[in-house]
């Protein structure tokens, strides 16, 4: 069978790429260059096995190699990878040029997996835990405003018997995270701190727990006052994930539980223009998902977050700010998500959101989550994994 005269062009770019890589390896060995492991891992992750297979298949069978198809191995792609490996600089990401030169810039190195409406490098979430002594400075709750908001946000719950099988664990690592409208004389984001369950994220956990129970889902809701616990242990607020990790482990070891899903509820420090979305005439507190990359279950957790984001956006367009992936250089990196392949950290709202907006978003999340939960449970039973 006569081979096409044009066949060499399909291999030329691949051969050039190999030559460049060999030259790069030789240069690294000769000059004893040090490559950032994070950059190397990200570069390798950009190569997908299915793309490699398709590339080699198309090279042998031109029927699978239409002219409009982009080549996987091109001089451009190879040169970009070479530059990234040799210098730890990604030409398309300005943060990598100054990441090692400007103190604190690495805190904004969060990877955007799915960008929700308005999400870009300028609106990335970042972590900042206040000192324990600041957390202990209790602020007064705006009692009258809280009662009024709770009255407007009241929801008739159907009284049902809690399911015996507990499969969902809800907790709040930063339980002190509160909201300015619920506190007296609170003006700036750093003021949004409270240990009163009515005014902090524990209240959101209670709402979510009750919603899920009414959907027939068994829930264990931890209401630990993390400020008090950290203070009693003589630990700084930066150790909050270690403390909540112990709570998670205790819950898992309880033989009365059959925990699969783990939801850590947080509140973002961004202001209202970023954390609020009007949907069908009502304001919702926007939410987003954070996935820790420093453990071997992160890909499965990432799939869960992406699926929930997609479902939320389908029903409530604009409610999700997206899905973010973090390593230890940008935060904790694990967030206790190594306990399960169905673990998630959900940031609900920001410092300026009130209970009406927050409760609407909690209700929206639990509606979507419960549908996903039951569909996943049915799929397990069909496949014999239940």
Show which residues each predicted segment covers:
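Non-catalytic propeptide/linker segments at domain boundaries
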Residues: 78-173, 177-187
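N-terminal membrane-targeting segments
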Residues: 1-92
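Catalytic cores of processing enzymes, dominated by hydrolases/peptidases
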Residues: 237, 245-264, 269-347
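Active-site-adjacent mobile loop/cap segments within catalytic or ligand-binding domains
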Residues: 323-384
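Sec/Tat-exported extracytoplasmic proteins
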Residues: 172, 208, 212, 216, ...
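Catalytic-core regions of hydrolytic enzymes
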Residues: 198-274
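Second-shell loop/turn segments in exported
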Residues: 189-201, 208, 230-239, 291-299, ...
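Long, well-ordered alpha-helical scaffolding segments within enzyme catalytic domains
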Residues: 203-206, 299-319, 356-380
């Amino acid at each position: 069978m006569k081979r096409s005269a044009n066949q060499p062009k399909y291999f030329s770019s691949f051969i050039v790429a190999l030559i460049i890589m060999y030259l790069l390896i030789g240069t690294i060995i000769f000059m004893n260059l040090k490559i950032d492991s994070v950059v190397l891992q990200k570069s390798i992750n950009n190569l997908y096995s299915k793309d490699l297979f398709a590339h080699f298949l198309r090279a042998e069978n031109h029927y699978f190699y239409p002219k409009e198809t982009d080549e996987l191995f091109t001089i451009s792609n190879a040169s970009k990878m070479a530059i990234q490996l040799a210098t730890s600089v990604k030409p398309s990401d300005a943060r990598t040029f100054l990441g090692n030169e400007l103190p604190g810039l690495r805190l904004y190195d969060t990877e955007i997996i799915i960008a929700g409406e308005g999400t870009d490098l300028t609106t990335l979430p970042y972590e900042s835990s206040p000192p324990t002594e600041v957390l202990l400075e209790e602020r007064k709750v705006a009692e009258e405003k809280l009662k009024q908001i709770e009255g407007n946000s009241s929801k008739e719950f159907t009284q049902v018997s809690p399911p015996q099988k507990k499969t969902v664990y809800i907790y709040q690592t930063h339980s002190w995270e509160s909201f300015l409208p619920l506190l007296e004389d609170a003006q700036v984001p750093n003021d949004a701190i409270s240990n009163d369950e009515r005014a902090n994220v524990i209240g959101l956990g209670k709402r979510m727990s009750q919603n899920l129970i009414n959907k027939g889902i068994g829930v264990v809701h931890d209401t630990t006052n993390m400020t008090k616990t950290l203070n009693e242990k003589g630990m700084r607020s930066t150790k909050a994930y270690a403390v909540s990790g112990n709570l998670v482990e205790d819950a898992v070891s309880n033989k009365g539980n059959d925990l699969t899903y783990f939801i850590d509820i947080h509140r973002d420090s961004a202001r209202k223009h970023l954390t609020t979305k009007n949907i069908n005439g009502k304001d919702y507190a926007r939410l987003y998902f954070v996935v820790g990359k420093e453990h071997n279950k992160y890909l499965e957790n990432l799939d869960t977050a992406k699926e929930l984001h997609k479902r939320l956006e389908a029903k409530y367009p604009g409610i999700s700010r997206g899905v973010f992936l973090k390593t230890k250089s940008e935060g904790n990196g694990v967030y206790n998500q190594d306990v399960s392949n169905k673990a998630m950290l959900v940031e609900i709202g920001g410092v300026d959101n009130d209970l009406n907006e927050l409760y609407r978003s909690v209700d929206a999340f639990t509606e979507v989550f419960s549908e996903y939960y039951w569909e996943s449970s049915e799929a397990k039973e069909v496949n014999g994994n239940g």
